UniProtKB/Swiss-Prot annotation:
InterPro entries: INO80C/Ies6, Vps72/YL1_C
Family: Belongs to the IES6 family.
Source domain of life: Eukaryota
Main location: nucleus
SMART domains linked to this entry: YL1_C
Function summary: Probably involved in transcription regulation via its interaction with the INO80 complex, a chromatin remodeling complex. Also involved in the regulation of telomere length.
Name of the protein in its database record: Chromatin-remodeling complex subunit ies6
Record keywords, A-Z: Nucleus, Transcription, Transcription regulation
Any one GO CC term of the record: chromatin
GO biological process: CENP-A containing chromatin assembly; chromatin remodeling; DNA repair-dependent chromatin remodeling; transcription initiation-coupled chromatin remodeling
Subunit structure: Component of the chromatin-remodeling INO80 complex.
Length: 117
């Protein structure tokens, strides 16, 4: 019996919890679908305000991210000769070894190629 009483004294689930209200009953949660949320949206009557459901938003003040033309990763650098964007020195070595005209094909994919007449 000694072992059982010592185990009971260490069991924290048997201790009184003065911080909990024994008479508390949780309110039932009411799940609503998207249609109900949109109907109850008070901003719908005011088109000048932006809300979760409005698709119009002001333009971003952050600069547009630039991506590497070869890998698609974030481009930190730009080659001054070919104007191709690249991610690191390995890609730069690949860009320097491109045959003539291949750089224009990469720029054409990005829609910033130069058409000479």
């Amino acid at each position: 019996m000694e072992k059982n009483s010592s185990v009971d004294s260490l069991d924290i689930s048997l201790l009184a919890r003065p911080f909990r209200n024994p008479n508390y009953k949780a309110q039932p949660r009411r799940n609503r679908n998207l249609r109900q949320i949109i109907q109850n949206d008070p901003v719908q009557n005011e088109p000048s305000k932006f809300s979760y459901s409005s698709i119009e938003a002001p333009p971003s003040v952050l600069p547009q991210p630039k991506y590497c033309d070869v890998t698609g990763l974030l481009a930190i650098y730009t080659d001054p000769k070919t104007r191709l964007r690249y991610h690191n020195k390995e890609i730069y070595g690949l860009i320097r070894e491109l045959p003539s005209g291949a750089d224009q094909e990469y720029l054409k994919l990005r829609s910033s190629d130069v058409v000479l007449k």
